[in-house]
Amino acid sequence: MKNKFKTQEELVNHLKTVGFVFANSEIYNGLANAWDYGPLGVLLKNNLKNLWWKEFVTKQKDVVGLDSAIILNPLVWKASGHLDNFSDPLIDCKNCKARYRADKLIESFDENIHIAENSSNEEFAKVLNDYEISCPTCKQFNWTEIRHFNLMFKTYQGVIEDAKNVVYLRPETAQGIFVNFKNVQRSMRLHLPFGIAQIGKSFRNEITPGNFIFRTREFEQMEIEFFLKEESAYDIFDKYLNQIENWLVSACGLSLNNLRKHEHPKEELSHYSKKTIDFEYNFLHGFSELYGIAYRTNYDLSVHMNLSKKDLTYFDEQTKEKYVPHVIEPSVGVERLLYAILTEATFIEKLENDDERILMDLKYDLAPYKIAVMPLVNKLKDKAEEIYGKILDLNISATFDNSGSIGKRYRRQDAIGTIYCLTIDFDSLDDQQDPSFTIRERNSMAQKRIKLSELPLYLNQKAHEDFQRQCQK
């Protein structure tokens, strides 16, 4: 019997204990809603990013990569509208001083109340008054006036802090792709349709970050801007919708029961979007946005053309047409997806004799360690370390564990998602060239004896079987 963690606090405590995440600047009492990734968190994040890149870039004939700078010319943000419009409606409770985003306050009160993203302060206030939405913290209805708060982090480039040297940490990776559209298209001799993918850090001075790593002020995005002719926009949109859903289930291990699609009604659409659908996941705090797909029309390239006075049109050599390409944008936050995967995968499993274990049921490609090498007793440590070195030479992510009883070591590895435990025993000494060992599988706890030379084939076969099982769910 498997039971999920009941609260976010329980899950976070486990992840901190075993080395996935740590509170930022913890020796100085931390920094609110900032997290550092420990050894296991780094491995898991890198595996997730590599898995995404493989699926949406490497395996695609029409998608290439880009790594644009975090700090861009401020005119980029002027053209995109971020300088003037990238803000959240901020409201405070006069009674308890709690602070909220007005739009999220309304949404949490009743998700069926739809209000446009670019609504005025007066429109937000009217909804709050009409529905008498009180403070969730103290239950009082005593609000300040709503004011808008710009989310961009401002800093200065150079030694003089004046208006001429103001720059911003990027709030999204997308604009770095748009301003490089022509560079990529020309240098790679690309013909529409094609996509440009990027994984990188973004920064937003969020009013109310929280829910662990769900919403933080520093985060990573995995995005594609797919450029195309207007007529094919909805077909490409649907293609990505299906591909993303399949990938979330088969590669990331998310259950369809914990996923749902939310299409933004017209009044909720961003100013650049003609259609947006979010995949929402059932986090421990409830259903929230996980992975978005937006049809951005030709808005972005058009506004950059207007301000820069540079030609960002595309000339179709076959039809002799010249036009500004339209864009489909699939976008996901690394940390948010990581949180969904960890929520889905981590259980407390009841075993026989009233025993229990924490089981992190991560997919093979995501697991920080595929193998833990364990000597049965300490006198076998040298042989175990020799085999451990040979496994590392096979480019297999592995760890060495010789602390505590073999049972405790099994439990420790189960709790961090390690797929297999290899136990080096006295029979392993019989063949110096091709030693054998016991291999224990994480989920079933079944054990089998194999030789070192058989290990790569065994792992590939098991990974394939795991993938097939997930696809059949």
From Swiss-Prot:
Residues binding ATP, per UniProt: 204-206, 214-219, 289-290, 333-336
Catalytic activity: tRNA(Gly) + glycine + ATP = glycyl-tRNA(Gly) + AMP + diphosphate
Principal subcellular localisation of the protein: cytoplasm
This protein's UniProt keywords: Aminoacyl-tRNA synthetase, ATP-binding, Cytoplasm, Ligase, Nucleotide-binding, Protein biosynthesis
Compartmental location: Cytoplasm
GO cellular component: cytoplasm
Record's keyword annotation contains Transcription regulation: no
GO molecular function, one term: glycine-tRNA ligase activity
UniProt-listed Enzyme Commission number(s): 6.1.1.14
Gene3D superfamilies: Anticodon-binding domain, Bira Bifunctional Protein, Domain 2
Pfam family, one: tRNA-synt_2b
Residues annotated as transmembrane: none
The keyword Methyltransferase is assigned to this record: no
Job of this protein: Catalyzes the attachment of glycine to tRNA(Gly).
Record-linked PANTHER family: DNA POLYMERASE SUBUNIT GAMMA-2, MITOCHONDRIAL, GLYCYL-TRNA SYNTHETASE/DNA POLYMERASE SUBUNIT GAMMA-2
Subunit structure: Homodimer.
The protein, known as: Glycine--tRNA ligase
Organism: Ureaplasma urealyticum serovar 10 (strain ATCC 33699 / Western)
